């Protein structure tokens, strides 16, 4: 039970930070746009939904590794990630270019990791 509570707490903090990025920062949604930003070196952090197709996930992780960009595996699916972004559609891949007022990039390294 303690582990479930901890994951819920971290999920809420990620969601609140995401909302702040949506209001005050710069970001791109979607696989193609995210890949483009990673290749250009503009992406600071990439967030992937947990039901992102394996080939896409591995390709983004590979390009992010080359560009030394952080990759965060969001614990919810693409519908939940879209809702967390305040959108009414599914979001599988999200790249943060400028976090704005949010401290999402500083707070992610302890949660970021390969799965």
Curated annotation (Swiss-Prot):
One of its GO terms (molecular function) is structural constituent of ribosome. The modification Phosphoserine is found at residues 10, 16. Keywords: Acetylation, Cytoplasm, Isopeptide bond, Phosphoprotein, Ribonucleoprotein, Ribosomal protein, Ubl conjugation. It comes from the Eukaryota. Its main location: cytoplasm. One of its GO terms (cellular component) is postsynaptic density. This is Large ribosomal subunit protein eL30. The gene is RPL30.
């Amino acid at each position: 039970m303690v582990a479930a509570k901890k994951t819920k707490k971290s999920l809420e903090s990620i969601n609140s930070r995401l909302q702040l990025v949506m209001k005050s920062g710069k970001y791109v949604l979607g696989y193609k746009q995210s890949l483009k930003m990673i290749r250009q070196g503009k992406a600071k952090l990439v967030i992937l939904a947990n039901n992102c197709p394996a080939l896409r996930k591995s390709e983004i992780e590979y390009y992010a590794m080359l560009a030394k960009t952080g990759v965060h595996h969001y614990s919810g699916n693409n519908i939940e990630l879209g809702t967390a972004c305040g959108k009414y559609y599914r979001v599988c891949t999200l790249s943060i270019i400028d976090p704005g007022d949010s401290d999402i990039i500083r707070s992610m390294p302890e949660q970021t990791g390969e799965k």
